[in-house]
Amino acid sequence: MKCPDETLEVLGWKAHFREQVTSEEARQCHPVRVMAVHRGKIDVAGAGFQRFIAPYIPGATPSDDHPTVGDWLLIDRDTLQPVRVLRRINLFKRRAPGDPRKEQMIAANVDTLFIVASCNQDFSVARLERYLVLAREVGVNPIVVLTKTDLTDSPETFAAAASAIEPGLRVEPVNGRDPASVARLAAWCGKGETVALLGSSGVGKSTLVNTLRGSDSIATQAIRARDGTGRHTTTVREMHRLDGGGWLLDTPGMRELQLSDAATGISEVFDDFIAVAQHCRFSDCAHGVEPGCAVRAAIAAGEFTSARFDRWRKLAAEDNVNASHVKRRTPD
């Protein structure tokens, strides 16, 4: 990823960021965007230059104060050291693997989220719902991209299952290896636009990135025939320049996306249950054996499936547990 000649606007600079910079900061600092995050260093680009710098900001203690891919920073013109992270438009984050007290930042300042799933045995409505909850929570427009349509005789079956998750959800089936097929995603990849890419291991994200870029620079791995899955081949979070002038952010495959403080997103994705629950006899109804439960009545009447109900309760319970861990979090 090279961008030494880009202007700030091409990199995604918007009024939201420009208005945060004081006149003194404008004289003393360069605004730069984080294009990639590596261990112990970040790749940043600004107007006319690109370089690696240390990611450490003096005095920053909360994790949200440290830069992640997609962030805009101010760096000192003389020392090129980070001064501060500009206030984000949005931030994707999850529970850190192995430590429920901590959060892991995924990406910042995203315009559109491509939720990638494959048309094979690895397709999971539950996993799509998790990603949709995340998108709704941070207020980013989600597009479900179904890959490997060339490997199935019935891509419309997978598209119908994805579309049924939420009314009006945009679903785009593509053959990730075919530029003509992938071109249907161009509407979200224009100049200065940032698209994030999320999906589990082996769904074809790297192949999709290569086609969108017109390049084979991202390593891909063959899928395992026995179960339709594969290993992810992206090892760093990185932004890739697209032919249409936008930027695509690829992330390592994540099978277990742990939600945190996502009550709003859950309510939006499962708003059908939320609406019916207002008619339960008791305001604190747990939708179990309580008398007068409108949700259970709707399931019995065939308005909802038990499977979707179980997924709703599972995500809500997971979010409650993880949110409580955050509240109890103590500094190391």
Question: Model-predicted segments: where are they?
Answer:
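Histidine-anchored nucleotide/phosphate-binding helix
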Residues: 126-137
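Beta-strand/loop nucleic-acid-binding surfaces
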Residues: 50-67
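Walker A/P-loop
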Residues: 201, 206-207, 211
